[in-house]
Regions:
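Exported/extracytosolic protein signature
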Residues: 1-180
Length: 180
């Protein structure tokens, strides 16, 4: 959206040598561009009788960083004694930057009950114990190696007719399987 209804404030008197501060807050909506390098520009104008008009611009830039969320599911349900259990971690990146190896992302969990015969994959690729993750079969603590989990940035698309932006998050899937 390049224009919007004008927000007008009237009736403010500023004495000679004085000042006034006007503060307002606006929420970013679905028309705001979110991809890397995007910005929102706000223009303000002061005018009135006997003064020279003043114009000022303020630019707010879209954050360029990963924005990760994680959900965890378990299967099968119900879990059977001495059976195999699978934890699936769906990691989504709604941000405009990749969560790359330099980001140092780790996923950790304490499995209770403790799992034995543990295996793990990330996006279908087997993870190597001791290299890609650590697992303590006594405590149930599982931790991926920093930077092993990478999640691509979201893809932002704007509807040419409505101007509404859609966010398609980058996705990574960690699957941990073991015996209880």
């Amino acid at each position: 959206v390049t224009t919007a209804p004008v927000f007008t404030i009237t009736g403010i008197t500023v004495p000679a040598g004085g000042n006034a501060m006007i503060i307002y807050e606006a929420m970013v909506n679905r028309y705001a561009p979110l991809d890397a390098g995007s910005s929102i520009t706000n223009n303000a104008n002061i005018s009135g009788g006997g003064i020279t008009p003043v114009t000022v611009d303020e630019i707010v830039r879209a954050q360029t960083a990963p924005l990760l969320t994680i959900t965890k599911s378990i299967s099968p349900v119900p879990v059977t004694e001495n059976g195999t259990i699978t934890y699936t971690f769906l990691i989504q990146n709604g941000g405009s930057a990749d969560a790359d190896a330099a980001s140092g992302v780790t996923v950790s969990d304490n499995f209770d009950p403790v799992l034995t015969n543990l295996t793990a994959t990330y996006n279908g690729t087997p993870l190597v114990p001791g290299t890609d993750y650590t697992y303590n079969e006594t405590s149930g603590e599982f931790v991926t190696t920093a930077g092993r989990i990478t999640v691509p940035a979201a893809v932002f698309t704007q509807d040419a007719t409505t101007g509404i932006w859609a966010i398609n998050p980058g996705v990574g899937t960690l699957v941990v399987t073991g015996t209880i």
